[in-house]
């Protein structure tokens, strides 16, 4: 079933994010570029409900019934309307991180050590912490230790996490392995949309390429990804489209041409548009 997300007029209450509108398709990697302080992180955090939204909407659309009539969703216009001309779509509240998770969103934060991991807890706790409801034993306030152990082992294997034990404190892992634990945590929630804020920041080259491969694999599985990055080559090499932010607003959208020099110049022009 083909899906897409449409964000319209998203404005945050306590930061500079203003009137952000864009479309995100199923299986797409959408980049977000911009200078420091341009509102990139604020965009992701507002989408996730971590920051207070003042106005704007997030809607889910489903194109399955259109594709069934012949052709693919791309063959049709970008908007679907009912017989009265009103746009059809399921509005998503995302007024808190908890509601965003229930709606299929996941956020990998920029500051891994400060807001991503729980340093004194072990790998198992860090892996299952966003999905604890699935480990409850009936009506009792107890968790299934065996199920948590199985899921953690599965994520360690799937993410190629290097650790002597799932009981190892996560603070003792390398930055790359810590980041892979965070990705594994969110995979257990089976998200539709992944919000990635500088996901390869502060990790070694080998781990970076593993993260790139993981992102591409998730997109092929139909996950929709919004990725902020401070590294232009990373965005150009990974993303289908790139939103460029300037002074809290989306200044434009760019589709990489394959000419790195030209692409970077065009993106920098947009990044300075509202300064």
Please give the residue ranges for each predicted region.
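Glycine-rich phosphate-binding loops of nucleotide-dependent enzymes
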Residues: 3-275
């Amino acid at each position: 079933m083909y899906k897409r997300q449409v964000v319209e007029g998203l404005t945050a209450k306590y930061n500079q994010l203003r009137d952000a509108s864009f479309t995100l398709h199923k299986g797409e990697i959408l980049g977000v570029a911009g200078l420091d302080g341009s509102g990139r992180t604020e965009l992701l955090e507002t989408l996730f409900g971590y920051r207070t939204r003042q106005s704007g909407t997030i809607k889910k659309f489903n194109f399955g019934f259109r594709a069934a009539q012949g052709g693919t969703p791309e063959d049709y216009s970008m908007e679907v309307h009912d017989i009265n001309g009103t746009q059809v779509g399921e509005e998503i509240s995302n007024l808190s991180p908890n509601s965003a998770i229930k709606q299929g969103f996941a956020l990998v934060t920029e500051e891994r050590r400060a807001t991503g991991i729980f340093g004194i807890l072990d790998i198992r706790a860090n892996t299952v912490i966003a999905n604890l409801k699935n480990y409850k034993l009936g009506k009792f306030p107890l968790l299934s230790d065996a199920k948590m152990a199985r899921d953690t082992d599965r994520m360690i294997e799937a993410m190629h996490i290097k650790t002597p034990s799932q009981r190892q404190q996560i603070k003792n892992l390398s930055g790359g392995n810590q980041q892979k634990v965070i990705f594994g945590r969110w995979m257990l929630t089976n998200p539709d949309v992944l919000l990635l804020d500088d996901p390869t920041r502060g990790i070694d080259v080998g781990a970076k390429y593993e993260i790139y491969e993981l992102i591409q694999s998730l997109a092929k599985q139909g996950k929709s990804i919004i990725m902020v990055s401070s590294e232009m080559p990373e965005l150009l090499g990974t993303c289908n489209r790139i939103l460029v932010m300037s002074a809290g607003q989306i200044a434009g959208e760019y589709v990489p041409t394959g000419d790195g020099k030209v692409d970077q110049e065009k993106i920098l022009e947009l990044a300075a548009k509202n300064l």
